[in-house]
Regions:
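Negatively charged
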Residues: 1-215
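Non-catalytic beta-sheet/beta-sandwich ligand-binding modules that flank or precede catalytic cores
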Residues: 214-250
Length: 250
């Protein structure tokens, strides 16, 4: 089997443990557990985390995979007794968890660098609406998502729109992002009639600097006082930089 596209789409009551499946040759999981209609999906792998052991190394698209699946919340990142999904070949994450209102797992271990900017199609899809209306999502409360390699991303429009995302993403390197409308809007509750309220954007301090890569250089001063010398009103400090530095005389 090389495609599982729309396999359980609109199978609203399906909820069995299929974590033992061999998915190593599958290239498309597009809309696999998508609601596909007005009703929401209830798939949660029978309550088992085994789905986190799937071999997804060949998958190229997870477009709309869990769209409208209001029950799914199993670990898909490494740790927690599962190996975690290998998504390094995935080029499209668009709307993967859109409307997956319970999903809140730590997927910071994912290698998402497979997205590309050399194709209009891949670029337009990319991470667009990946977690849109996934109201519980905050990467399981972990800041590990800050380690995602986003250099290939060019569309993050509504990526975290109406979520609980409050992790610091300011370290993301996003030199190619061209579409970022409503990137992250934090969800804080509903009125009695179900209308969304109290929506606030992710703070500027936690938002990536669009079109740029932040400097990751750090400076560590020695803790050995013998390395720090004061002579004739001059202070000599011994320091270590995390990156190669080219000294510039002043």
């Amino acid at each position: 089997v090389t495609t599982m596209e729309s396999m359980f789409e609109a199978a609203y009551a399906f909820d069995q443990n299929i974590g033992s499946w061999d998915t190593s040759n599958v290239t498309s999981m597009e809309e696999m557990f998508s609601k596909g209609g007005s009703n929401n999906m209830s798939f949660n792998n029978g309550g088992s985390p085994d789905i986190g052991n799937w071999d997804t190394s060949s998958v190229r698209t997870m477009y709309f995979m869990f769209n409208g699946n209001t029950e799914f919340d199993q670990p898909l990142g490494s740790g927690g007794g599962v190996s975690g999904w290998d998504v390094s070949s995935v080029k499209v994450f668009e709307s993967m968890f859109q409307g997956a209102s319970k999903f809140n797992q730590d997927i910071g271990s994912w290698d998402v660098s497979g997205t590309q900017t050399n194709s209009d199609y891949w670029c337009a899809a990319g991470f667009r609406k990946m977690f849109d209306y996934a109201i519980a999502f905050n990467n399981g409360g972990s800041d590990s998502i800050k380690n995602w390699d986003m250099t290939g991303a060019c569309n993050v429009e509504q990526m975290f729109h109406i979520t609980s995302m409050n992790q610091d993403l300011s370290t993301w390197c996003v030199p190619n992002v061209t579409s970022k409308n409503s990137f992250a809007t934090i969800y804080n509750g509903v009125h009695g009639n179900g209308n969304l309220r109290d929506r606030t954007p992710l703070s500027d301090a936690k938002t990536p600097v669009w079109g740029k890569c932040p400097s990751i250089a750090t400076l560590v001063l020695t803790s050995d006082d013998s390395d720090n010398i004061i002579t004739t009103s001059q202070v000599t400090l011994t320091a270590t930089f995390s990156l190669s530095m080219s000294p510039t005389p002043t």
